């Protein structure tokens, strides 16, 4: 990297692509992304939520990466050793489905290839994807420690997974049993709740009559799935439902199967649904399964894994589910037991990966007993050892933990962490951390490993400590566990955040992180969810190519707050790009006007605007620091942008220009450097590339303590309250208000840019102070002459003058200096005439009975509002 004094003259326009490549490579070479080993401060640690290896990063990833990088850069600038550990998730079913689709294009299946060859194909596909994701994160400016990058199928995580599986099994917390799971018939595996998309579909409710065994009548049940009737093992009613008084304890005869089943009472029954009586099929409905456990009901599975009906379905054996439904409905009708059919909209689960309808099914799988593990994880949050932001998600977390169910961790896939269980022909089952070679029971060597793999979330739950070397007691684990912040989207609090807390408490007896920061979703500029089908998806890499990384980062975080969704469209992206350009142009102006490279010392007695901008800079620094500490990054960004653009650029630099042209005045250069230095450092976490580039040009003018420091590790500004100057802020506030009001007045009356207006400013006690800035007022508002007078003006606006009433100040502007009064009078007369025509037209229309009867109320209301506006405007024009 060239010496600062050797840097070429600044380009007129900011060239993002060139700058980004240069600085990222430089930061890597300088090892700035690694935690400082010499610091004795407490480390700040974020373990990156590992994106799925399946594809390119989307805007959600861009938001995650930007928010985390903001935190990392901010803490790095405070001298803390920072570790941002990156990684990628193997993505289980999501990745396997992609590769299987590629094989299908070649007319092949994984079964034809065999497990070993298929896994080779998986690795061939995965490795380039990992590199691509890494490169994309680099383009986002992510200052991760890439030497610590981890993949969930690396040797370390594999060792950790086997360790925790074995430990939990030995404690009796992992077991193999039959429970209800989500079964995808197309993917051929159990899937997690997260991998099920629920869609509202048009269906029916069938009202079916089940005869009482004693012949005294019928119980009519309402169901949306008559095809599962053969698996019914009870009819349930609510205990408080008086319609079925005396029914509990009786039996009904299950039609078609002629099997006796009991009538039971359970509070889970919704009395308002259908008839208030429901069929209970424990093997094919999650709620029925729980009810079956409560009442010790038999669980009869009537479907095969391909969703065809099995031998337990009686006459429907071998049928598809659809054919079975048609058979049952037809048979019930012929038996006189079909009472009626109603249309109904209900939620149906679909596989997120292949869109097949999910079948709830009792299946033999591996499960984790969650209740004993959930207790310490719940206490960790309730006691405040872990803070969840925003706080409203504490209740969500608590509710989920208190009602937690056993977790199905086995998947009928080939890609993933294979379950560390082996079976011997002698019947022995071996659970081991390392591959066994001999059966401990019979000494046999023909051991076969369980074919299933673990749920992706199982290995992800170990992420905060497996990435640091656990189960080995590494130096990284000692130094960086627990992490500081876990930043992720609010929609995976159950599936990932909760499980990380569970696993951390179990493995480490310590929380995995101190704070959980949950961000919202990014929606389009209309507030709609982005999707490929809607065509409203924004590709972050294309945005970077068009606007630059800093603009993307600034846009995705602007207006964000913990847990709330935000909008993003071209308008916001262009605004972010414009802000970057504004920053570049303002900084370039400052740097180009600093003269010879040297440390600039401000005068002992500073002019008002210098004291004002220094005071404002320190207040903004205090506000931004507080907001950053509170994780209000979007609000901190807004405060910062308002100050940079609305105060430093629009006002201070404009005032400084006047002094730069006057060699006799106090030089604004030292203050320009001081403020710009703070601005760049405050902004660096949000816009790292442009700030580092501008800093490189500013460095020759900085104090010696900063001159040899890159901004990425420069000290973050600290607010100096002794610089707060309320008087300067008050006076400058009045000056800004005067100029802004005169500018607005010019705009309202379309005053030509070349034309000067006149103004008398009645400033009371502030007249003498403001009088020192007469030239600035005239220049900035294009008003001349301007008279600043003591006292106050009590008159009101007339046809010949406009009176602007400001805070303790009145500004009087003669109309003749803004417009030609004769021409203006003709224009007003013509406008009144046109408005009166419109008033007559609307009055006639709103008196028309037919119009009022036929037109929508919204249209009528709109016309009335329009009429009232025209009448008010005519009144205003006539009184002017």
From Swiss-Prot:
Its main location: cytoplasm. Keywords: Aminoacyl-tRNA synthetase, ATP-binding, Coiled coil, Cytoplasm, Ligase, Nucleotide-binding, Protein biosynthesis. A motif ('HIGH' region) lies at residues 51-61. CDD domains: Anticodon_Ia_Val, ValRS_core. Residues 815-854 form a coiled coil. Pfam families: Anticodon_1, tRNA-synt_1, Val_tRNA-synt_C. It is found in: Cytoplasm. Gene3D superfamilies: HUPs, Isoleucyl-tRNA Synthetase, Domain 1, Valyl-tRNA synthetase, C-terminal domain. SUPFAM superfamilies: Anticodon-binding domain of a subclass of class I aminoacyl-tRNA synthetases (SSF47323), Nucleotidylyl transferase (SSF52374), tRNA-binding arm (SSF46589), ValRS/IleRS/LeuRS editing domain (SSF50677). InterPro entries: aa-tRNA-synth_I_CS (IPR001412), aa-tRNA-synth_Ia (IPR002300), Anticodon_Ia_Val (IPR033705), M/V/L/I-tRNA-synth_anticd-bd (IPR013155), Rossmann-like_a/b/a_fold (IPR014729), tRNA-bd_arm (IPR010978), tRNAsynth_Ia_anticodon-bd (IPR009080), Val-tRNA_synth_C_sf (IPR037118). Its EC number is 6.1.1.9. GO terms for cellular component: cytosol. It catalyses: tRNA(Val) + L-valine + ATP = L-valyl-tRNA(Val) + AMP + diphosphate. One of its GO terms (biological process) is valyl-tRNA aminoacylation. ATP binds at residue 532. One of its GO terms (molecular function) is ATP binding. A motif ('KMSKS' region) lies at residues 529-533. Catalyzes the attachment of valine to tRNA(Val). As ValRS can inadvertently accommodate and process structurally similar amino acids such as threonine, to avoid such errors, it has a 'posttransfer' editing activity that hydrolyzes mischarged Thr-tRNA(Val) in a tRNA-dependent manner. ValRS has two distinct active sites: one for aminoacylation and one for editing. The misactivated threonine is translocated from the active site to the editing site. The C-terminal coiled-coil domain is crucial for aminoacylation activity. Monomer. Belongs to the class-I aminoacyl-tRNA synthetase family. ValS type 1 subfamily. This is Valine--tRNA ligase. It comes from Dehalococcoides mccartyi (strain CBDB1). The lineage of its organism: Bacteria, Bacillati, Chloroflexota, Dehalococcoidia, Dehalococcoidales. The gene is valS.
């Amino acid at each position: 990297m060239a010496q600062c004094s050797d840097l070429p003259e600044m380009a007129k326009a900011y060239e993002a692509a060139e700058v980004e490549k240069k600085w990222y490579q430089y930061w890597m070479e300088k090892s700035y992304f690694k935690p400082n080993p010499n610091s004795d401060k407490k480390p700040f640690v974020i373990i990156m939520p590992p994106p799925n290896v399946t594809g390119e990063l989307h805007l959600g990833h861009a938001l995650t990466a930007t928010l985390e990088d903001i935190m990392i850069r901010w803490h790095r600038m405070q001298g803390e050793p920072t570790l941002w550990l990156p990684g990628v998730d193997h993505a289980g079913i999501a990745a396997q489905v992609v590769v299987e689709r590629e094989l299908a294009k070649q007319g092949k299946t994984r079964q034809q290839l065999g497990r070993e060859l298929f896994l080779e194909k998986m690795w061939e596909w995965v490795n380039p994807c990992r590199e691509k994701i890494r490169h994309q994160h680099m383009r986002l400016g992510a200052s991760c420690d890439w030497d610590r990058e981890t993949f969930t199928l690396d040797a370390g995580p594999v060792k950790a997974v086997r360790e925790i599986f074995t430990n939990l099994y030995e404690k009796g917390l992992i077991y193999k049993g039959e429970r209800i799971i989500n079964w995808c018939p197309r993917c051929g595996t159990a899937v997690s709740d997260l991998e099920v998309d629920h869609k509202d579909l048009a269906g029916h409710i069938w009202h079916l009559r089940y005869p009482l065994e004693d012949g005294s009548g019928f119980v009519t049940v309402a169901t949306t799935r008559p095809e599962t009737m053969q698996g019914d093992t009870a009819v349930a009613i609510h205990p408080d439902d008086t319609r079925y008084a005396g029914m509990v304890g009786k039996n009904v005869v299950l039609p078609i199967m002629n099997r006796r089943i009991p009538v039971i009472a359970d509070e889970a029954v919704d009395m308002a649904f259908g008839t208030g009586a429901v069929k209970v099929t424990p093997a094919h409905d999650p709620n029925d399964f729980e009810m079956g456990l409560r009442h010790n009901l038999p669980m009869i599975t009537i479907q095969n894994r391909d969703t065809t009906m099995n031998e337990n379905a009686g006459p429907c054996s071998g049928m598809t589910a659809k054919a079975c439904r048609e058979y049952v409905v037809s048979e019930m009708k012929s038996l006189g037991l079909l009472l009626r059919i109603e249309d109904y909209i209900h939620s149906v689960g679909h596989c997120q990966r292949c869109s097949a309808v999910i079948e709830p099914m009792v299946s033999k799988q591996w499960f984790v007993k969650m209740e004993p593990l959930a207790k310490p994880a719940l206490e960790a949050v309730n006691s405040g050892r872990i803070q969840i932001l925003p706080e409203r998600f504490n209740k969500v977390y608590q509710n989920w933990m208190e009602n937690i169910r056993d977790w199905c961790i086995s998947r009928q896939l080939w890609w993933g962490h294979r379950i560390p269980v082996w079976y011997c022909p002698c019947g022995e089952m071996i659970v081991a951390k390392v591959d066994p070679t001999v059966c401990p029971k019979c000494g046999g060597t023909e051991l076969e490993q369980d074919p299933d793999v673990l749920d992706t979330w199982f290995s992800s739950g170990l992420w905060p400590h497996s990435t640091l070397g656990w189960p080995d007691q590494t130096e990284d684990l000692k130094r960086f566990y627990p992490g500081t912040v876990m930043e992720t989207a609010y929609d995976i609090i159950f599936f990932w955040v909760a499980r990380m807390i569970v696993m951390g408490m179990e493995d480490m007896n310590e929380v995995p992180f101190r704070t959980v920061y949950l961000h919202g979703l990014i929606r389009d500029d209309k507030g709609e969810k982005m999707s490929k089908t809607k065509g409203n998806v924004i590709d972050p890499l294309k945005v970077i190519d068009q606007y630059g990384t800093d603009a993307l980062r600034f846009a995705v975080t602007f207006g964000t707050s913990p847990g709330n969704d935000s909008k993003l469209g071209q308008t916001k992206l262009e605004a972010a790009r414009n802000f970057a350009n504004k920053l570049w142009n303002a900084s370039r102006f400052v740097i180009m006007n600093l003269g010879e490279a040297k440390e600039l010392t401000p005068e002992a007695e500073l002019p008002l605007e210098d004291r004002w901008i220094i005071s404002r800079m320190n207040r903004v620094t205090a506000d931004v620091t507080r907001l950053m500490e509170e994780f209000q990054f979007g609000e901190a960004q807004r405060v910062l942008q308002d100050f940079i653009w609305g105060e430093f650029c629009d006002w201070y630099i404009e005032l400084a220009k006047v002094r730069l042209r006057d060699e006799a005045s106090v030089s604004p250069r030292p203050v320009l450097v001081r403020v710009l230095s703070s601005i760049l450092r405050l902004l660096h976490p949000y816009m790292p590339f442009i700030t580092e580039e501008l800093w490189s040009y500013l460095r020759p003018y900085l104090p010696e303590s900063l001159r040899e420091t890159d901004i990425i590790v420069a000290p973050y500004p600290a607010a100096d309250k002794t610089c707060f100057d309320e008087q300067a802020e008050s006076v400058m506030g009045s000056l800004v208000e005067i100029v802004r009001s005169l500018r607005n007045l010019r705009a309202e009356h379309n005053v030509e840019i070349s034309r000067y207006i006149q103004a008398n400013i009645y400033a009371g006690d502030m007249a003498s102070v403001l009088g020192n800035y007469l030239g600035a007022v005239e220049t900035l508002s294009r008003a001349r002459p301007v008279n600043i007078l003591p006292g106050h003006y009590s008159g009101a606006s007339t046809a010949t003058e406009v009176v602007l009433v400001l805070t303790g100040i009145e500004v009087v502007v003669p109309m003749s200096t803004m417009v030609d009064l004769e021409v203006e009078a003709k224009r007003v007369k013509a406008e009144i005439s046109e408005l009166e025509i419109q008033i007559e037209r609307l009055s006639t229309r709103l008196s028309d009975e037919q119009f009022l009867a036929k037109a929508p109320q919204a249209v009528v209301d709109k016309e009335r509002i329009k009429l009232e506006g025209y009448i008010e405007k005519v009144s205003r024009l006539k009184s002017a």
